[in-house]
């Protein structure tokens, strides 16, 4: 079973894809535009995304490029009515992993999804171990004492950055830049809120506070 993010502005097609995928045993989040897609991506951490190019608020290729620039690594399958070879090159160059041209059969979508997941799972696992903490870079998961902690994409990005810099202070500005490449979206208090939630989740598995706020400098991950 996979958690699939479907990003499609056509309501009938979006519903059809959602139902077919659910009938095949998958969990599905269905977004009608890029803004909603970003929400599901950050909150539900999907395994794979199916993205239509003609979204009302942002071009699908732009959305994929933005995800890739923010180190979002999940496989992306594009739905497109564009059949020219130049269009296909543009799709793949944007950071998409594969594409299906419209009209399509749902069986082809399923087959390409499975192929992408097999390819993704075949990549060598990259893990950072600072016992009892473990970060699986390929799965974007944080474990403590071999128990996976459920994190949002933003929370995971913070923890990966702090653990990569174990024992070193990471500035708030540096974290904000990774979370929000678009300067207009950055609000300094957002990091404080995320840190509060993150500390609570970690302390439910590990009794000591491993994230220290260094006043005027940033944050420090350090085992005590």
From Swiss-Prot:
The keyword Chloroplast does not apply. GO terms for molecular function: phosphorelay response regulator activity; transcription cis-regulatory region binding. Its main location: cytoplasm. Keywords: Activator, Cytoplasm, DNA-binding, Growth regulation, Phosphoprotein, Repressor, Transcription, Transcription regulation, Two-component regulatory system, Virulence. Residues 3-117 form the Response regulatory domain. Residues 125-223 bind DNA. It comes from the Bacteria. InterPro entries: CheY-like_superfamily, OmpR/PhoB-type_DNA-bd, Sig_transdc_resp-reg_receiver, WalR-like, WH-like_DNA-bd_sf. The keyword DNA-binding applies. The modification 4-aspartylphosphate is found at residue 52. Phosphorylated by PhoQ. One of its GO terms (biological process) is regulation of DNA-templated transcription. PROSITE patterns: OMPR_PHOB (PS51755), RESPONSE_REGULATORY (PS50110). Gene3D superfamilies: 3.40.50.2300, 6.10.250.690, Winged helix-like DNA-binding domain superfamily/Winged helix DNA-binding domain (1.10.10.10). GO terms for cellular component: cytosol; protein-DNA complex. It holds the Pfam family Trans_reg_C. It is found in: Cytoplasm. NCBIfam families: PRK10816.1 (NF008078). Member of the two-component regulatory system PhoQ/PhoP which regulates the expression of genes involved in virulence and resistance to host defense antimicrobial peptides. Promotes intramacrophage survival of S.typhi. Is required to enhance bacterial resistance to bile in the human intestinal cells. This is Virulence transcriptional regulatory protein PhoP.
């Amino acid at each position: 079973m996979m958690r699939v993010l479907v990003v499609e502005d056509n309501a009938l097609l979006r519903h059809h894809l959602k139902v077919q995928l659910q009938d095949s045993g998958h969990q599905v989040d269905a977004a009608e535009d890029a803004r909603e897609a970003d929400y599901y991506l950050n909150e539900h951490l999907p395994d794979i995304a199916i993205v239509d190019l003609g979204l009302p608020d942002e071009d699908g290729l732009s959305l994929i490029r933005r995800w890739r620039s923010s180190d979002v690594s999940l496989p992306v399958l594009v739905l497109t009515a564009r059949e020219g070879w130049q269009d296909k090159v543009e799709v793949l160059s944007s950071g998409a992993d594969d594409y299906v041209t419209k009209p399509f059969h749902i069986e082809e979508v399923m087959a390409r999804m499975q192929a992408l997941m097999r390819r993704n799972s075949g990549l060598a696992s990259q893990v950072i171990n600072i016992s009892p903490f473990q970060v699986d870079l390929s799965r974007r998961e944080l474990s403590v004492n071999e128990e996976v902690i459920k994190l949002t994409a933003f929370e995971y990005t913070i923890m990966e950055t702090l653990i990569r810099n174990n024992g070193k202070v990471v500035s708030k500005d540096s974290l904000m830049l990774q979370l929000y490449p678009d300067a207009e979206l950055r609000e300094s208090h957002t990091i404080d809120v995320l840190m509060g939630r993150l500390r609570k989740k970690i302390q439910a598995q590990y009794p000591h506070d491993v994230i220290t706020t260094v006043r005027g400098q940033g944050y420090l991950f350090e085992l005590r």
